[in-house]
Regions:
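Extracellular "leader-to-stem" segments immediately downstream of a signal peptide or signal-anchor
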Residues: 4-79, 84-87, 93-97, 101-200, ...
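Surface-exposed loop/turn segments connecting beta-strands in extracellular beta-rich domains
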Residues: 87-88, 153-154, 213-215, 224-227
């Protein structure tokens, strides 16, 4: 048997042992030599909003309005039905579960304007203001991204990627934080958005979703507490 065959066989075994198809319903306790919190699946209010797709253009507005409305009402689940949804940056809010139905695909825009205004984020350890993430949250509690749907990042042929070519987080490190704003205006470049990157959040839950084609890091919780990420592809 060739080395290539052995490597392929190991890869197939590994793929077959991970992902949502092999994910148990229960979250097992973490065994460690020190005290760990009990990780549990979050419980959201029973309220549900089913998002309606825009007939033309991108669907950022109806999805974001559903998230905002649900959070203001005390929380619940925002359901994205099957279909290809073109969208800009979405901001998750407290006590809301964004649920991607099987067959639902969020295809994120590659245009800078769809990620404005600039938001607080980090790039290579440097705090600054830029595009943030496709799925972003700041200072929220009890947020979730669940379901059997798919999150598809922008292509590398997009405007955002091209406007990042000369950017380095080192250029802003000597400026005060308030001056580290990179929103693409006045010919300025931008920092690439991560795919899922909450910051300063508590109780973050991600389960079952497939991530495909990201411009930068896919899943990057920053300054967050009590995070559960399981069964992803």
């Amino acid at each position: 048997m060739s080395l290539t065959s052995i490597i392929c066989g190991i890869a197939l075994l590994t793929i077959g042992e991970v992902g949502p198809q092999n994910m148990p319903d229960t979250i097992e306790p973490v065994e460690s030599p020190f005290v760990m919190p009990l990780f549990e699946r979050p419980v959201f209010p029973e309220s549900t909003i089913l998002v309606r797709m825009e007939q033309e253009g991108i669907s950022t507005k109806p999805i974001q309005e559903a998230i905002d409305s649900m959070s203001c009402r005390g929380g619940g689940t925002v359901v994205v039905p099957p279909g290809v949804w073109r969208t800009g940056r979405l901001i998750l809010k407290s006590h809301v579960n964004l649920h991607l139905s099987e067959g639902a695909e969020l295809h994120f825009s590659g245009n800078i304007i769809d990620y404005l205004p600039a938001v607080f984020t980090r790039d290579e350890g440097v705090e600054l203001y830029s595009l943030g993430a496709c799925l972003y949250a700041d200072g929220q509690e009890n947020i979730a991204l669940t379901g059997k749907g798919k999150v598809v990042g922008p292509p590398t042929s997009c405007e955002i990627y091209k406007r990042n070519e000369s950017m380095s987080s080192d250029k802003g490190i000597r400026k005060p934080l308030a001056d580290r704003i990179y929103d693409g205006k006045n010919g300025e470049g931008v920092f690439l958005p991560k795919t899922f990157a909450p910051i300063n959040c508590k109780n973050v839950f991600v389960e079952g979703v497939t991530f495909e084609r990201g411009l930068y890091w896919n899943i990057v919780p920053q300054y967050c507490e009590h995070i559960v990420i399981r069964g992803l592809q």
